[in-house]
């Protein structure tokens, strides 16, 4: 019966003005409505161009880069502490939608390097300028300059879109925010400026929407069910290192590297053996603590977080090993994924 096709065509024409979902609902009570809903969905998917691109996050230490990354991804991929240099690697978080894939890259805070490890960390930041489709430059309210003039010059001369995010606005007032926005509009005239609180999730959705607008048309780079490019062992290492950053002072947290030697996953349990690398024998004693109490605390807290992350019971063994001067060794830095 030709009237069946007329029934289908009329709501289909209305699709562009009334929206796929609302229009389809009106016809769900009819057999034609089910056909319409399915066919309209296919048409919608075919006619919506897919977007994908790299969105790289840069800024000074402790301005909220990792907090924003985790807010976007919806998972705790980057560890967060109050100490500078918490992020050492460039960490990719993947946000997927039906018609987009956003590849977010969290980078170490910008510093002047004092040893080879820090030089490698700054190489990660430099690489963020090379492949970005959108650059997120994060400052915190009250901040007035980037700590490295060369990086700042790259931002102000960038040919790609720059979104400058003034973070932690929950810690200030309207006057300080206006002053900060005026300052950064003058310093980075090529940037779009947003006021946000990544921790409180304020203003984040507006930034998210703007990023999607700016993404280039492209097929997805990764499978749509993939969350990151890092392996499970990386997140084990970072979780343990986070606890060390939280509980130890002075040079200890910055002299430590974690290496997961064993990672065996069964149906109900994951068995992990990890080594905590330090540079000196004296640091080894501090990490272990009196009667092993300090390293026991690190193990217990790490295990709890890893059980939340993996959704399974975790059996975690940790021990400490001296790896002298690893932060200035090209070979050791490559081993830990910082070079080459």
For each predicted feature, which ranges?
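Canonical P-loop GTPase G-domain recognition
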Residues: 170-227
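P-loop NTP-binding site
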Residues: 232-340
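Short, positively charged and aromatic/hydrophobic N-terminal segments
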Residues: 23, 30, 40-44
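G-domain G4 guanine-recognition motif of GTPases
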Residues: 107, 140-142, 163-176, 194-202, ...
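Conserved G1/Walker A P-loop phosphate-binding module
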Residues: 46-114
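Conserved C-terminal guanine-recognition region of P-loop GTPase G domains, centered on the G4
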Residues: 123-191
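Nucleotide-state-sensitive switch-loop elements of NTP-binding domains
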Residues: 83-146, 172
